[in-house]
Amino acid sequence: LHAARRVYKLRLKRCSLSDLEERVLGIRREDDIPGSEIPALWQEFLKTKNDEKLLSVFDHNLQDVQSMAVLLRTIYDAHQEPMQQVYMEDLFSVGKVYDSAGRYDIAERCYVSVENGVCRGMAGRALTRIYRRTERTADAIALLEGMIASNSGGIFPYVELAKIYEHRLRQPEKALTY
């Protein structure tokens, strides 16, 4: 579930297996026993040795395993073809996974492709970090100036431009303009 949460948490907020089944895989369980009841059924079996109610536990566990297999394939596909993501939150999140792994080329493609909303500002910040790490100062400046021109990113682009001009380009006078 950890890998699924890294991809889907930004969009879904809650990422229990049942949430992922329903909202990512489109699976809705019928006549399923809630996982919270399983320990009590197990304790009852230990006391009575009546295994009749354990069948529902086995069925529940089988569904869990099957869902995890389908979810694993879905996550694999999301990483293999990140640009096929329907939701910008998922595309941004896949970019973060690649960013964390040092695969800046793929992360950059994901971040650049994020088109709207809150994720666009987060993608701009993440792209700035990649450009700084890879010493692409001109790209960072262009991105940050674009963020300022479009009035996105709040104070972030101003602070980052000031840092670039003061520390990297050694132009403290220019840094003060931001």
Task: Name what the model sees in each region.
Residues 94, 126-127, 131, 161, ...:
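Structural register within alpha-helical repeat arrays
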Residues 101, 134, 168-169:
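Structural motif corresponding to the intra-repeat A-B loop/turn of tetratricopeptide repeats
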Residues 1-66:
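Metal-dependent phosphoesterase core characteristic of DEDDh/y 3'-5' exonuclease domains
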Residues 98, 131, 165-166:
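Residue at a conserved register position within TPR or TPR-like alpha-solenoid repeats
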Residues 118-119, 152:
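Short coil turns that delineate tetratricopeptide repeat
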